[in-house]
C-alpha cells in the first residue's frame, strides 16, 4: 500500500504524469495526464473520467469552487473541457456510471457507493504502512523546500506572518510552516504561481506545544 508516481513521454517528448494510490484494502485510484494536459482518474480499475468528475462527486461542486481550491492549474482547466458534468449531482452520477455501468442512476445509490468505497474503514484502509508512505510523499515541507514564496504565509491559528512573499523556503522554515497546519502555500515558478496544498499532517509535539504557547500568551 502507498502512493506511487510515474513519468512517461508522448511521441513529441511531452511529459505525461501518472499516480496510483494503492490501499491495503479497497479501491485503487489511478491518475494520469494526456498529451493535451487533461487530467484523468480511474476508480477501481474502471474507465477513466476527468479528474473534475471525481472532485465534484466528493463535494466540490462548481468550476469556480474547484478553481478556488486548486488555483488556475492548467491541467484542471483542461479537464473542464472534457467534463460534461457541472455540479455535485451530475459528477456523482457520471462517476457512478463508470463504476456501476448498466445500473439505474440514482443520486442516493451513488452517494452510498462513494461513502462505502472510500469512507468506510471496513472497506477502505491504507493501513499504517500505506498511511506512512502517503504522508511522507505528500508532506508539505518537502514540496515547498527551496521554493520561493509567491505570497505571505500566515499561521491560521494566530494570524502571524510566518514568512513573507519572496522568501526562499529553508528546511527549517518548511518545518515551521508544515507544523503550523497551514492549508496551502503559493510558490513561484518560471511559468506561473502554483498553489501547493497541504495534507495537514503535523509533528504532533510541535503543534501541541505551539498551540499551548499561544493559548498561554493570548490576553
Predicted regions: what they are:
Residues 1-216:
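N-terminal non-catalytic structural scaffold regions of very large proteins
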Amino acid at each position: 500500500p502507498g502512493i506511487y508516481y510515474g513519468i512517461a513521454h508522448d511521441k513529441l517528448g511531452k511529459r505525461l504524469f501518472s499516480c496510483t494510490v494503492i490501499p491495503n484494502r479497497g479501491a485503487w485510484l489511478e491518475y494520469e495526464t494526456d498529451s493535451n494536459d487533461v487530467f484523468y482518474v480511474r476508480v477501481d480499475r474502471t474507465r477513466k473520467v476527468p479528474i473534475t468528475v471525481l472532485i465534484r462527486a466528493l463535494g466540490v461542486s462548481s468550476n469556480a469552487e474547484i478553481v478556488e481550491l486548486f488555483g488556475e492549474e492548467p491541467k484542471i482547466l483542461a479537464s473542464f473541457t472534457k467534463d460534461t458534468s457541472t455540479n455535485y449531482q451530475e459528477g456523482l452520477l457520471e462517476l457512478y456510471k463508470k463504476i456501476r455501468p448498466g445500473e439505474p442512476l440514482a443520486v442516493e445509490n451513488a452517494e452510498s457507493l462513494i461513502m462505502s468505497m472510500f469512507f468506510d474503514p471496513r472497506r477502505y484502509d491504507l493501513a499504517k504502512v500505506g498511511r506512512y508512505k502517503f504522508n511522507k510523499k505528500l508532506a508539505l515541507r518537502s514540496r515547498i523546500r527551496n521554493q520561493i514564496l509567491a505570497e505571505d504565509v500566515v499561521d491560521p491559528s494566530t494570524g502571524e506572518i510566518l514568512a513573507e512573499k519572496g522568501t526562499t523556503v529553508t528546511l527549517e522554515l518548511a518545518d515551521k510552516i508544515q507544523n503550523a497546519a497551514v492549508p496551502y502555500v503559493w510558490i513561484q515558478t518560471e511559468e506561473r504561481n502554483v498553489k501547493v496544498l497541504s495534507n495537514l499532517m503535523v509533528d504532533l509535539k510541535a503543534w501541541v506545544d505551539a498551540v499551548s504557547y499561544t493559548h498561554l500568551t493570548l490576553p
